[in-house]
Amino acid sequence: MNAIDRARRLLSSDGATLSVVNGKRERIYYDRGVKSLTDVLDSNRALLGGASVADKLVGKAAAMLMISGGVAEVYGEVMSDGAVETFEKFGTKYSFGTRIQGITNRDGTAPCPMEQTVKYIDDPAVAEEAIKRTQKILKLRAQGGKMKKLGFGMMRLPLLSSDQKDIDFEQVNKMVDEFLLHGFEYFDTAWMYHEHTSEIVARECLVKRYPRECFKLATKLPVFSLTCAEDMQKIFDEQCKKCGVEYFDYYLLHNLNKGDYPAVQEYDAFAFARKLKAEGKIKHYGFSFHDTPQLLDRILTEHPDAEFVQLQINYLDWESEGVQSKNCWEVARKHNKPVIVMEPVKGGTLAKVPADAEGLFRAVRPDMSVPSWAIRFAAGLDGVFMVLSGMSNLEQLEDNMSFMERFRPLNAEERLTVNKVSGVIKGTGAIACTACRYCTENCPKNIPIPDYFSLYNLHLIEGKNGWSSQFNYYEALTADHGKASDCVKCGACEGHCPQHLKIRDLLEKVSGVFES
């Protein structure tokens, strides 16, 4: 009897799912799915090299693992088209009892998670790593419990250049992997982020690389872009295509404010969201909001069906007369609506604070990073179930995960320290920009407004004798963009600013510093 026939005979044992024959060595395994294969690869990899293997069910994922382990010949009682194509591509000898188109999950309701994992992978070694990551993540999900409060905001992704579309996909992949492996699962994107590229990044770095059950995905309907009711369906369909999904876990009407709420009413955007939910195309719907607590109260009163609200909340804006974080949060609590927090670090402003403010933090908790104070402040508020952080590199991600994996709210002393730091920052005269970049869309002079405001704020912190390194960065930016002094005062930017900043006046401040 040859080796593959011996493997087939062993597979007929009661409960056997996998058998391996390599010379005189024979092994039988009983785990379902690809677990037996990954276990062998981890504990006894040499057993597979040159082996003959029989398996109850062989899909592309199992085929990739067998090839990665160096299996010589495979028999599958049931084998998928993807497995056959994979074996033929790599020249692995195979045979089967029954051939099927594809493998579903154990409920028969969706594709097998492991098959989804390797769908776009052609390298067996890469496939092995991906399968093992997915196994770990699914094991975490199976443990249950509440969703962890840190959300991956896809608004400030790492870049390879100053071009907002020039995304560093390799670094984003690493960030997504680490985020999921640490038990986090919420990803937030939007139609216009990164100049309409963010949703595509979600598809390439998340959706194509992980089974759908590994993550929660949120995106937003750009109500400010609507010209008619029919636009809503067109945009939603395009979002599904860009993200590569059949449904969204959370869907938001984006940036409701006094200027755009009439369009929401005219086109009945909430009814559209209800329709999508009834069709199973979204799981939950709500809205993000940048305006007064009075308008928020009105919207929640008129649309009690909204399941959650996304608010800008951070310790600098908590008592702000413009943003009114505290008052808006209180309105959400009055209506018993769960809250998602955006801008907890205020676009990076609260990640780098003046030295005396940082000293206050260090005196109380020298082990905690400056941004951690801002995120913990927001995450500790009643009713907050998610805090979004627009992380731009792996280091920021790792820092955030370090204190959010086992979240602990601020204590009384820490809250007092935050209040003191807020006062110090306000005393510097920093511009309250969050770098959302909504203002840059229609600037006739191509002025990178958020970048200039960031340089201005850093200059306030670092500047000595009227000079700082930010002058060099300003000069570099002006080589390809309009200067702050090029502003023609058209005001197109100010109508789009969620912070209600007087951008035209502030650009004069910027030019006064960097162009004087």
Regions found by a protein language model. Name each.
Residues 52, 93, 147-151, 185-186, ...:
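Structural preference for beta-strand elements that scaffold enzyme active sites
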Residues 431-446, 483-500:
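Local cysteine-cluster metal-coordination motifs and their immediate loop/turn environment
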